[in-house]
């Protein structure tokens, strides 16, 4: 679990997301409250439930990007799902309980990686011994079993020194490695994914753990042996317990496009992919127990963050019970031309930085001037105003159009420097931006 303070979390989000300070503050406080709760005594800790968040804002302003960055910062089980993929229980499609199952699977992977990393030093020693056994086979007794020696031989110590110094990295050896489990692909109808994964696990375990001889360079064999030995040191039962504990105490679920499951006014009959999904989400958000293949998982202290554009529907169109379980509302603002300028220059991996790096691979150096950046931002904002407002995603469309000729001819332009200024942008984009019909279909 992350121990970052809210200020540190916001500072980290600022490196990738421009504006939207209220949303950043809310998720930062929610993340910090996870840590604060764990510092309480057990009796009070059980009573403190997470304050779920509803993020409201037009498309392309940073809702999903906040979720992506939060997943990296949280250091906790995290899953992002689309609300539109689920249907009410009993109908064809995924049921909402699969959210918790997927969250538990991601926790198992996360805890396994942490456990492997914790045991890496010991695993490296064991892998080293296995390689030395191949290079200098131990002496055997009359029954064909390796003799137990009090101290390693001088030759073994000499090879160990060479191995650690990398002198033997390119030497090829034949070594027995665990064979890949038998692959079984089972196609199941929607909603039956849990049964499918259990059947696959059963078939994979039928053959037992087999070993297969492989010829590899020592440096490649060492990597595989370390992974294999580290996996042996992981206790599967402890792994499940720790993963379930991590999900129950620190799990975060991000539900995107929640506005798409709001009930439409004049719809009659069963609304299985809208209001039905909301009703199924209620017990998860309120707190219930979900059965997974790893064990029972309680959702009482899982943090839920929902987001939606709410351009057609409004938050009040959600069923009242679900509204009550999303007490913190955060409104994200539409982006201005000034925001677009900052998006093009400030983030660590801004779109302009990406295009520069891509062209550098062909030996072409791209320079964006300040007035060029400003003109690109104005063009994107203008198209958003005159057609559909898709937020910062419009920058990708505009830049792709702007860079099309350079990208096409890059292999013939090696060693050249191309400056993208206001005149260059105007020459390539003004006609498209001015014509609303063209910009609607091209930009």
Curated annotation (Swiss-Prot):
Residues annotated for ATP binding in this entry: 18, 60-65, 256, 321, 393
CDD domains: RecA-like_HslU (cd19498)
GO BP term, example: protein unfolding
Entry annotated with the keyword Nucleotide-binding: yes
Keyword ATP-binding: yes
SMART domains: AAA, ClpB_D2-small
Keywords attached to this entry: ATP-binding, Chaperone, Cytoplasm, Nucleotide-binding
Cellular component, GO annotation: HslUV protease complex
Coiled-coil region list: none
Family in the record: Belongs to the ClpX chaperone family. HslU subfamily.
Quaternary context: A double ring-shaped homohexamer of HslV is capped on each side by a ring-shaped HslU homohexamer. The assembly of the HslU/HslV complex is dependent on binding of ATP.
Protein known as: ATP-dependent protease ATPase subunit HslU
Source organism per UniProt: Cronobacter sakazakii (strain ATCC BAA-894) (Enterobacter sakazakii)
């Amino acid at each position: 679990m992350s121990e970052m303070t809210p200020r540190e979390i916001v500072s980290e989000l600022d490196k990738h997301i421009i504006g939207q300070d209220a949303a950043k503050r809310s998720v930062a406080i929610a993340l910090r409250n996870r840590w604060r709760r764990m510092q309480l005594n057990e009796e009070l800790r059980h009573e403190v439930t997470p304050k779920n968040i509803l993020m409201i804002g037009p498309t392309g302003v940073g809702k999903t990007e906040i979720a992506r960055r939060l997943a990296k910062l949280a250091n906790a089980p995290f899953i992002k799902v689309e609300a539109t993929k689920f249907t009410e229980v009993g109908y064809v499609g995924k049921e909402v309980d699969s959210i918790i199952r997927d969250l538990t699977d991601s926790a198992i992977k996360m805890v396994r990686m942490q456990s492997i990393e914790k045991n890496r030093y010991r695993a490296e020693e064991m892998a080293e011994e296995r390689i030395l056994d191949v290079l200098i086979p131990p002496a055997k007794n009359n029954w064909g079993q390796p003799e137990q020696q009090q101290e390693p031989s001088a030759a073994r110590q000499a090879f160990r020194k060479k191995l650690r110094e990398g002198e033997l990295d390119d030497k090829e050896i034949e070594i027995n490695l665990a064979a890949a489990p038998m692959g079984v692909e089972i196609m199941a109808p929607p909603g039956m994914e849990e049964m499918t994964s259990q059947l696959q696990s059963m078939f994979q375990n039928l053959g037992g753990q087999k070993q297969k001889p492989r010829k590899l360079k020592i440096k490649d064999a060492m990597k595989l042996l370390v992974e294999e030995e580290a996996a042996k040191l992981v206790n599967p039962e402890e792994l499940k317990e720790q993963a379930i504990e991590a999900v129950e105490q620190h799990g975060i679920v991000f539900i995107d496009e929640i506005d798409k499951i709001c009930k439409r006014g004049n719809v009659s009959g069963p609304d299985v992919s809208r209001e039905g999904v909301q009703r199924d989400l209620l017990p998860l958000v309120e707190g219930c127990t979900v059965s997974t293949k790893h064990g029972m998982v309680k959702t009482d202290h899982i943090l839920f963050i929902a987001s939606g554009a709410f351009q057609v529907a409004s938050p009040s169109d959600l069923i009242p019970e679900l509204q009550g379980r999303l007490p913190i509302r955060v409104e994200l603002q539409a982006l201005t031309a000034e925001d677009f300028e900052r998006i093009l220059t400030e983030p660590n991996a801004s779109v302009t930085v990406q295009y520069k790096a891509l062209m550098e691979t062909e030996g072409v150096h791209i320079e964006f001037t300040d007035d060029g950046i400003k003109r690109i931002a104005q063009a994107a904002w203008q198209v958003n105003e005159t057609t559909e407002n898709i937020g910062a995603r419009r920058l990708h469309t505009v830049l792709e159009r702007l860079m099309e000729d350079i990208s096409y001819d890059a292999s013939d332009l090696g060693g050249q420097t191309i400056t993208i200024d206001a005149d260059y942008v105007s020459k390539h984009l003004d006609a498209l931006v001015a014509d609303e019909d063209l910009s609607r279909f091209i930009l």
